[in-house]
Amino acid sequence: MTNFNNNKLNELIQKVKEGDRRSLAKAITLAESTRQDHQDHSKFVLDKLKNNSKNALKIGLTGTPGVGKSTFIETLGLQLTQNGKKIAVLAIDPSSATNGGSILGDKTRMELLSRETNAFIRPSPNKGSLGGVSKRTREAIRLCEVAGYEIILVETVGVGQSETVVSEMTDIFCLLIAPASGDELQGVKRGILEISDIILIN
């Protein structure tokens, strides 16, 4: 990543406010980095932008792996961008418990949406964080709001009933499930069903 001084950081801040996607990606990378200098730079950027956040509609989407979250997001995202909306997708991928790596492959499932000029797609590793999101998802949401995205979709890791943290940072929490999912005992347990605003049968 680029070595930043105050001038470069101020330039980055200005470009994020102008909605430049490359600069937004750099700002999110700074926020997600574990390097101390990057954390210091990120704090500087976020402090400068704290009064610039716009009120975007934030939608969280969860569901078991393979239920079709990415496909649903691309379909919804294309419809929104074609209606003139600016949307950001924050796709959280699981990190390996063995080596800490992450494939970050969700963007490849949104090929059509990734070509839209009004769309920003950012895959991020969860780095072992519980709750379906990463430790810096809140910061990424704030940066997307500053960049002028009207609708922010947060796609969780997709591992099941523990994915509740995203519901606390979004306005609408959607659960995608396949037909005939679960049994009677699962229905009694409820779990994530209790906090879902919308249940989508995909």
Language model features: what each stretch is:
Residues F72:
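Hydrophobic positions on the alpha1 helix immediately C-terminal to the Walker A/P-loop
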